[in-house]
Regions:
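Detector for C-terminal structural segments
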Residues: 29-37, 321-350, 408-417, 441-558
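Gly/Pro-rich hinge or "lid" segments in bacterial periplasmic/extracellular proteins
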Residues: 186-246, 250, 260, 357-358, ...
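Ligand/substrate-recognition segments at binding pockets and active sites
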Residues: 227-231, 370-452, 526
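Surface-exposed binding/hinge segments that line
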Residues: 151-198
Length: 558
């Protein structure tokens, strides 16, 4: 007798009441099975009370919900922003970093930062948050030599961390730094859970799948990964959070491999972050959604390796810059704004440069590069007196075929290549897979590099333009070295007088403009799509898209 017949025999033996219950149970189980097949990552909560579902595009999905590794993955940053809390937080209304779990006092000489923890702070498991957790996060983890996030570790290089008492921790820095305070927005980790984990192994630890933080939301359903490439996590409002409670009881995040995948299932989400480019019209044409535009402190540029034999000549760099008509490049763009200086605190209009092919050709002539019109084999390419060709290598990241990133990257690179070849350059373009691209960037094996840079909360230029940062882990991608620029960058860090700082910024912008280490092209414009189920969402003056959650206590269900 097979299994089915056995079940039928058992059910026939039931009385009428038991048969009804059995049939109902089978029906419920069948519905649940259908739901799991059709919606393997949940029904998404569109009709559920106080549940708000956001869609995120991330090729790698949500991976590690840990505040010390959010630089690796934007999707992780979104979730971590709600799960964890730091000593300080970014306030988009004041555009400043303000007190959060810690109350800060700074010494008169601006080298000592003392935090006193608020009363009543608790982790999501109900245990108290103390200064020991702060000391553990910064001293035992970030400053450990084996900690893998080199950029974060560099931010605290030379910093002395002292545990004063159970509520107080002190940070001592070598020199005043107006930007240093922005480092304290980093979420704090629970010592009582992670003290036995080697910092070198923290990125792979299971804690990152179902973390315990002290933020406004706690994990309700741990991180799940599905065969169709989606990842999902559900958070619930934390009863232990010290701040104002949100009206949103549950936040659900679903990460899709591509925007196309998300749009196919857009009726399953309430909000979508970082909509851009050709996808804008998909939401404009959908009556459910309205779009909120926002910009981030980031830009895309072509960095010129000043250690390249050809690019060591300023006239060559000037020719590359002057030949690019940014207005033509961006004429049909709905998600890009022209940029002429990397200093986001300054007005871009004040640093506008004029495109001129005549000046570009003149600069190449001044550099000693001429056409060899009499030689057919050398036609169209300039050469110097040593018969060295005006030949450059140009690298860019290769994105997945058919994606918006791939289309836009190729479009811009091909535009630039066409312009430069028209004035006598021979450009060898390489689109490189992610790991190869990173390797080439770290080793600085390129003449021209097409890439974007994000500045973060402090707008500190040190990492990007100081000569000490032209290293594999540094972000001085042009190998730009200038004593005057280094001095200005250091003064901007050390001077707390705002007028003096503004003057130094303008002088720095002037030096960068004159030296031409890069061609600054544009900054992206993004859109947040919301179906209006909640009100109060603001994207004004955010630094990261996740900063919208700074005001989540003001979000209300309509």
């Amino acid at each position: 007798m097979n299994f089915f017949h056995k079940v039928v025999s058992v059910v026939r033996a039931y009385d009428y009441r038991d048969k009804v219950i059995s049939v109902a149970a089978v029906a419920i189980f069948s519905l649940m099975l259908v739901k799991m097949i059709i919606f393997p990552y949940g029904m998404l909560g569109l009709g559920e009370t106080k549940v708000y579902t956001e869609g995120i595009v991330s090729k790698n999905g949500i991976q590690n919900i840990n505040p010390l590794f959010v630089d690796y993955n934007e999707a992780d940053r979104e979730v971590s922003r709600l799960v964890f809390a730091g000593l300080m937080k970014y306030d988009s209304e004041s555009k400043a970093v303000v007190d959060d779990m810690g109350m800060l006092s700074i010494s008169e000489d601006k080298t000592e930062y003392v935090f006193k923890m608020r009363d009543g702070l608790k982790w999501h498991d109900g245990k108290p948050v103390t200064a020991e957790d702060v000391y553990f996060t910064f001293h035992d983890v970030i400053l450990d030599p084996s900690f893998p996030n080199e950029i974060l570790k560099m931010n605290f290089s030379g910093v002395n961390v002292e545990l004063v008492d159970e509520k107080t921790v002190k940070f001592q820095i070598e020199k005043p730094n107006i930007f240093f305070v922005a480092n304290f927005v980093i979420g704090i980790l629970p010592k009582h859970i992670l003290s036995g984990v080697d910092p070198a192994d923290l990125l792979q630890n299971e804690f990152n799948k179902k973390p315990v933080g002290a933020g406004s939301y706690m994990v309700n359903e741990s991180l799940e990964t599905f065969p169709n490439g989606r990842t999902q996590i559900t958070l619930e409002r934390s009863p232990y959070y010290y701040g104002d409670a949100s009206d949103i009881e549950f936040m659900r995040f679903i990460a899709y491999p591509s925007m196309e995948d998300l749009i196919d299932e857009v009726d399953s989400v309430n909000g979508v972050v970082k909509v851009s480019g050709k996808y804008i019209s998909d939401f404009q044409n959908n009556d459910r959604f309205e779009l909120i535009s926002y910009e981030l402190p980031q830009y895309t540029a072509v960095f010129m390796n000043m250690e390249s034999k050809i690019l060591d000549d300023k006239n060559v760099r000037l020719a590359l810059m002057k030949s690019v008509d940014k207005d033509t490049l961006l004429a049909d763009s709905t998600d890009k704004i022209r940029v002429d200086t990397p200093l986001m605190e300054l007005s871009q209009e004040d640093w506008y440069y004029k495109y001129s092919l005549d000046e570009a050709n003149g600069a190449l002539k001044d550099a000693g590069y001429e056409y060899r019109e009499e030689d057919i084999e050398k036609a169209g390419i300039r050469y110097n007196d040593d018969e060295d060709a005006l030949e450059l290598n140009f690298i860019a990241r290769l994105y997945d075929e058919g994606t918006y990133q791939e289309e836009e990257t190729k479009k811009v690179v091909e535009f630039l290549n066409s312009v430069w070849e028209s004035i006598g350059f021979s450009i060898q373009v390489e689109f490189l897979p992610e790991e190869d691209f990173k390797s080439r960037v770290m080793s600085r094996k390129y003449d021209l590099l097409f890439v974007g840079q994000a500045l973060g909360y402090n707008l500190d230029t040190y990492s990007y333009w100081h000569s000490t940062q032209s290293t594999p882990v540094g972000q001085n991608l042009s190998n730009y070295k200038s004593f005057q620029v280094d001095s200005l960058i250091e003064d901007i860090r050390y001077v707390f007088n705002l007028d003096k700082r503004k003057s130094n910024l303008k002088e720095l912008a002037k030096n960068i403009k004159e030296d031409v280490p890069a061609i600054f092209l544009y900054r992206p414009v993004y859109y947040y799509a919301t179906d209006g189920r909640v009100t109060g969402v603001s994207m004004k003056d955010v630094v990261f898209s996740s900063d919208r959650f700074a005001g989540i206590s003001k979000w209300k269900f309509d």
